[in-house]
């Protein structure tokens, strides 16, 4: 959408009126239509002030083509090799989101059914490592819906990573107590029960058992934290933890109500993408 602003000047640097019109730019290709239908479609478009049929600017397209080729080359650069399929699954089990994966075998894989998406878990662990490198982090959290595709076994490129994580999120560090961390997981599970499978949480340095049949506040059990020595210990609800997550759920989105209540003094945008 491109905005058009009409702001007449009074000749002295001011103005006494302001008007505008948003324009939705659309192409002129309308598909294959009979002549009368094509004429009717064009007339309808012309009658809509917000719609503007626009042809690509040849000079701008030529400039952009050079950069598009560079983006294509950058996207082809290898960054890793996946030794096996990294399956996509938002929610473990067979009752919700059981056919998310596009890779053969992933939807029936026993590990995926029991534990959820491999690729979501990998993203959560990557967030944790980035947080530990830049400012420190005890745990990480990623919503299952923020990860969009599987990764097939074989070379992984920059382009693959952008497809897995297509959103322009940044990593945010939050300070919260163990009790608030537990409440955050309960928030996410409540959102899942309400029908939002994308809220299902994946974490680095945290593990738990979940029973979605239980009421709110009782769905998370055996919640443990992997400490700096690599040992799994019970989460201390009175202790303070530094959690790295994406800015979307840090703001309380996707049902993460508790995170949205944290004050500015307890959050830091790292600006890491």
What are these regions (language model features)?
Residues 71:
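Secretory-pathway-linked proteins and extracytosolic
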Residues 75-116:
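Glycine-rich phosphate/diphosphate-binding loops and the adjacent beta-loop-alpha structural elements
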């Amino acid at each position: 959408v491109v905005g058009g602003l009409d702001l007449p000047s009074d000749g002295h640097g001011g103005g006494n009126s302001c008007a505008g019109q948003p324009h939705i730019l659309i192409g002129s290709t309308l598909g294959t239509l009979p002549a009368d239908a094509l004429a009717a479609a064009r007339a309808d478009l012309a009658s809509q002030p917000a719609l503007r049929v626009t042809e690509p600017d040849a000079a701008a397209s030529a400039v952009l083509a050079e950069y598009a080729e560079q983006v294509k080359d950058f996207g082809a650069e290898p960054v890793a090799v996946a030794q096996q399929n990294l399956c996509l699954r938002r929610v473990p089990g067979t009752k919700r989101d059981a056919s998310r994966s596009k890779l053969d075998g992933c939807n029936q894989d026993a590990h995926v059914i029991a534990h959820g998406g491999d690729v979501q878990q990998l993203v959560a662990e990557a967030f944790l490592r980035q947080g530990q490198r830049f400012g420190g982090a005890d745990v990480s959290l990623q919503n299952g819906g923020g990860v969009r595709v599987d990764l097939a076994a074989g070379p992984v490129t920059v382009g693959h990573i952008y497809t897995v994580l297509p959103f322009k999120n940044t990593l945010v560090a939050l300070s919260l107590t163990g009790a608030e961390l537990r409440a955050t997981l309960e928030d996410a599970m409540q959102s899942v029960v309400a029908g939002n499978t994308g809220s299902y949480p994946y974490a680095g340095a945290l593990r738990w058992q979940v029973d979605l049949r239980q009421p709110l506040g009782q769905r998370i059990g055996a919640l443990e934290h992997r400490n700096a020595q690599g040992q799994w210990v019970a989460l201390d609800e009175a202790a303070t933890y530094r959690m790295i997550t994406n800015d979307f759920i840090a703001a309380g989105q996707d049902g993460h109500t508790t995170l949205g209540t944290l004050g500015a003094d307890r959050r830091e945008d790292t600006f890491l993408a």
